[in-house]
């Protein structure tokens, strides 16, 4: 032994509570929400590090070349979820403000982060379905079942629950090469 401890990689667990619902009416959901044949999914809290500001312009490039694609953006804008009247929110905001001064560059501040404005700026409102709210567990399946691929264009990565949910639905993952993604997202496999 060289005195070094072994390294064990632990990945985000797969949530077995999220799985396809048999006989779910995918075509009706697509029709109601104006979705095309091929649907890409951005799911989860809208946070700057998750790269939605990169997803929307990239999708726009694809949509300029194809008329059979749609993008679903499904998730809450993180900073809009905080109740400013609560003491816990004031404490969190204060701690984040202190941490921000110590660790973050000014460009990393996401309190005013609004990538959804890009949809209108690019004129792709008819190609993007936005569900900017909390999604209860029993409704998660809908967004994954109607989609063909999950998009994880993170600027930096932490273990991703969205990635794990995508695996339950046997979906391809389109991801940036950051964090653990190069180890868990294999080209041609998932």
Language-model-derived ranges and their functions:
Residues 1-23, 35:
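Donor nucleotide-sugar binding/catalytic pocket of nucleotide-sugar-dependent glycosyltransferases
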Residues 10-13, 42-44, 74-76, 131-132, ...:
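Short hydrophobic "strand-cap" motifs at the C-terminus of beta-strands
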Residues 22-39, 63-66:
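Nucleotide-sugar donor-binding and catalytic loop/hinge architecture
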Residues 34-50, 56-59, 71-74:
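Conserved donor-binding/catalytic core segment of Leloir-type glycosyltransferases
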Residues 43-47, 62, 77-79, 134, ...:
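Short donor-sugar binding/catalytic loops of nucleotide-sugar-dependent glycosyltransferases
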Residues 84-138:
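Nucleotide-activated donor-binding/catalytic signature segment of Leloir-type glycosyltransferases, i.e.
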Residues 142-159, 168-171:
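Acidic donor-binding loop of glycosyltransferase active sites
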Residues 165, 178-190:
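Short acidic/histidine- and often glycine-rich active-site loop of Leloir-type glycosyltransferases
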């Amino acid at each position: 032994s060289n005195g070094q401890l072994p390294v064990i990689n632990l990945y985000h667990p797969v949530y077995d509570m999220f799985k396809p619902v048999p006989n779910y009416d995918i075509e009706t959901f697509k029709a109601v929400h104006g979705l095309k044949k091929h649907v890409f999914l951005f799911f989860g809290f809208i946070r700057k590090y998750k790269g939605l500001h990169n997803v929307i312009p990239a999708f726009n490039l694809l949509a300029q070349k194809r008329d059979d694609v749609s993008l679903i953006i499904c998730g809450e804008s993180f900073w809009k979820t905080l109740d400013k009247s609560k003491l816990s929110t004031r404490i969190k905001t204060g701690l984040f403000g202190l941490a921000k001064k110590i660790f973050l560059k000014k460009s990393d501040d996401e309190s005013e982060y609004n990538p959804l404005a890009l949809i209108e700026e690019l004129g792709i409102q008819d190609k993007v379905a936005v569900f900017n709210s909390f999604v209860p567990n029993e409704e998660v399946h809908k967004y994954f079942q109607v989609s063909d691929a999950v998009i994880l264009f993170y600027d930096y990565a932490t273990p991703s629950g969205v990635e794990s949910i995508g695996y339950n639905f046997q979906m391809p993952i389109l991801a940036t090469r950051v964090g653990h993604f190069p180890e868990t997202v294999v080209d041609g496999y998932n």
